[in-house]
Swiss-Prot record:
Keyword terms of this UniProt record: Aminoacyl-tRNA synthetase, ATP-binding, Cytoplasm, Ligase, Metal-binding, Nucleotide-binding, Protein biosynthesis, RNA-binding, tRNA-binding, Zinc
The name this protein goes by in its record: Threonine--tRNA ligase
Role played: Catalyzes the attachment of threonine to tRNA(Thr) in a two-step reaction: L-threonine is first activated by ATP to form Thr-AMP and then transferred to the acceptor end of tRNA(Thr). Also edits incorrectly charged L-seryl-tRNA(Thr).
Superkingdom in the source lineage: Bacteria
Annotated segments matching region Catalytic: 242-533
Length: 640
């Protein structure tokens, strides 16, 4: 009979097979009430599942990360229960857990409305209040098929077809509603009170736009209502920071139907863009990169040789001229290899670092477009390092150091680094993969910072390093990458003369720091809520007069600041000074300079910050020094 070993090392003996719930009850009534599931010998199981032999057991409660995932998964099933009660002809598809929530894909003859979502949420709350038990039954495959046939659940039957080796399946019964899942799930609906449905969107069966359209109901669920309230507050703050809203408020950019996924940059937004580009140009030049420019439109022959035509053609914009097919480039790498291939290269020429602010276009589905975060036309801070295998470690280490420096300059200090390693389907020998992964791992170790492996997540031809930034709302943004690639040089016949006078293939390191300028600017807008650090702000200082008598001196101050390289403008309107200050504070200008008679007389400016801090009156030259210091700090939080 089983001996159960608990996480603290204590043991409990039972004279019969025992369920997880029974073990919890033997420890205490409070734990039994909080038990969601168990982890038996490291494997998650339902609270009702029995343990028949000696095992280790961890009781899972809402406080555990696994517990939160179970709550969310069970909430997805609860969506199904409510939908089938309200809309019996709806057909249920899948309901997985996602970051901070869940969704359920549903086929229904008409689009769900916000009123439908409110009704579904209300029915879910009514079902929770019934406090019913969720019943698990392991059921033979044939019976599962018969059950879903009788209920007309066509998509469930298709999913069963995808699992030919499953002889028995877990069915979870929410009263009359039944769903199929590996589990585990909550034992009772009382655990599901802290939830909220968030939105409805479209989706496609199996994610393929050629298939029938489904409707996706999203929701979030938490261990308790306090956590849910904190999440809702965070989402509300994110909505206030939405780059689309702030972009309009600050007159940065717009998008319109005639050019879906293409950005119309206004002067203010283009100013931010130009600062980014000039900064990255200098950073890359200082680190040994040479800048190049390659064509926008390239014959399909090159894309066929690179492999992109067979794997990526549907995402490429194409055109034809004089009986030749062309594609607008979706990436820069094949073109950079063409530059490398011009002229004979020696090992003495390596490493060669080619950088390009490459304008790329990808035919993203219209439903996937999102402001300037997900677009069809974008510019990358793209570069490719051509080097020998022996140079990979140093190049990777230098790139990591540079990338972290750039992120700190933009105000991001919480950075996760991950190494994606060999997938099951890959090219190249294990020895080559060992060396490539080892070089990147050694480079990461040299940074002195924590990093983690992502096993099996590398490209089929090589490992890669990913950089993920955390913003002020705790959201993660995957930005920089360093991809090891021996494949493209082979396909495009790149070579150099090695020290032994033989031809060898270079290793190609694809790398980007910001990723796309458009997406990175969107991130900056939301991270700073539009209140850019002085070095990025479209207007760094606005000079305001109190009466017409100060207009000439205000214009003189703007001229002096402009000649010093600052972005300043005047506001000489016949409006009250309080009105002007409020307006430019809302426009998030870092410094507000007020000029009255006293300032004209002393050749000074009265300085306020957009946060409302009064810095007092100072000579124009002193303010210029203050602004120069603010600009030199960039977005750093320290005095580096």
């Amino acid at each position: 009979m089983p001996i159960i070993t608990l996480p603290d090392g204590s043991q409990r003996s039972f004279d019969h097979p025992v369920s997880v719930a029974e073990v919890a009850q033997s420890i205490g009534a409070g734990l039994a009430k909080a038990t969601l599931a168990g982890k038996v010998d490291g494997r998650l199981v339902d609270a009702c599942d029995t343990i028949e032999r000696d095992a280790t057991l961890q009781i899972i409660t809402p406080k555990d990360e696994e517990g939160l995932e179970i709550i969310r998964h069970s909430c997805a099933h609860l969506v199904g229960h409510a939908v089938k009660q309200l809309y019996p002809t709806a057909k249920m598809v899948i309901g997985p857990v996602i970051e901070e929530g869940f969704y359920y894909d549903i086929f229904f003859e008409r689009p769900f409305t916000p009123e439908d979502m409110a009704a579904i949420q209300q029915r879910m709350r009514e079902l929770i209040d019934k406090d019913y038990d969720v019943i698990k039954k392991m059921t033979p495959r044939a019976e599962v098929i018969e059950l879903f046939k009788s209920r007309g659940e066509d998509y469930k039957l298709r999913l069963i077809d995808d699992m030919p080796d499953e002889k028995a399946m877990g069915l979870y019964f929410h009263e009359e509603y039944v769903d199929m899942c590996r589990g585990p799930h909550v034992p009772n609906t009382r655990f599901l009170k802290a939830f909220q449905l968030t939105k409805i969107s479209g989706a496609y069966w199996r994610g393929d736009s050629k298939n029938e359209q489904l409707q996706r109901i999203y929701g979030t669920a938490w261990a308790d209502k306090k956590q849910l309230a904190a999440y809702i507050q965070r989402i509300e703050e994110a909505e206030k920071r939405d780059h689309r809203r702030i972009g309009k408020q600050l007159d940065l950019f717009h998008l319109q139907e005639e050019a879906p996924g293409m950005v119309f940059w206004h002067p203010n937004g283009w100013s931010v863009y130009q600062v980014l580009e000039q900064y990255m140009r200098k950073v890359q030049r200082d680190h040994g990169y040479v800048e190049v420019r390659t064509p926008q439109v390239v014959d399909r022959i090159l894309w066929e040789r690179s492999g992109h035509w067979s794997n990526y053609a549907e995402n490429m914009f194409t055109t034809a001229s004089e009986s030749r097919d062309y594609a607008v480039k979706p990436m820069n790498c094949p073109c950079h290899v063409q530059i490398f291939n011009q002229g004979l290269k020696s090992y003495r020429d390596l490493p060669l670092r080619l950088a390009e602010f490459g304008a790329c276009h990808r035919n993203e589905p219209s439903g996937a477009l999102h402001g300037i975060m997900r677009v069809r036309g974008f510019t990358q801070d793209d570069a490719h390092i051509f080097c020998t295998e022996e140079q990979v470690k140093k190049e990777a280490a230098d790139f990591i150091k540079l990338t972290l420096q750039v992120y700190r300059d933009f105000g991001f200090t919480d950075i996760a680094m991950k190494l994606s390693t060999r997938p099951a389907k890959r090219v190249g020998s294990d020895e080559l993969w060992d060396r490539a992964e080892g070089a990147l791992a050694d480079a990461l170790n040299e940074s002195g910072l924590a990093w983690e492996y992502q096993p099996g997540e590398g490209a089929f031809y090589g490992p890669k390093i990913e950089f993920t930034l955390k913003d002020c709302l705790g959201r993660n943004w995957q930005c920089g990458t360093l991809q090891y690639d021996p494949n493209l040089p082979e396909r495009l016949d790149a070579s150099y003369i090695a020290e032994d006078n033989n031809r060898k293939r270079p290793v190609m390191l694809h790398r980007a720091i910001l990723g796309s300028f458009e997406r990175f600017i969107g991130m900056l807008i939301e991270h700073y809520a539009g209140a850019f650090p002085a070095w990025l702000a479209p207007t760094q200082a606005v000079v305001m007069n109190i009466t017409d008598k100060q207009a000439d001196f205000a214009a003189e101050v703007v001229r002096i600041l402009g000649e010093s390289g600052f972005r300043a403008k005047s506001d000489l309107r016949n409006e009250k000074i309080g009105f002007k200050i409020r307006e430019h504070t809302l426009l998030k200008v870092p410094y507000l300079l007020v000029i009255g008679d006293r300032e004209v007389e002393s050749k000074a400016v009265a300085v306020r910050t957009r946060e409302g801090e009064d810095l007092g009156s100072m000579p124009v030259t002193q303010f210029a020094e203050l602004l120069a210091q603010a600009v030199s700090r960039r977005g750093r939080q320290d005095s580096e």
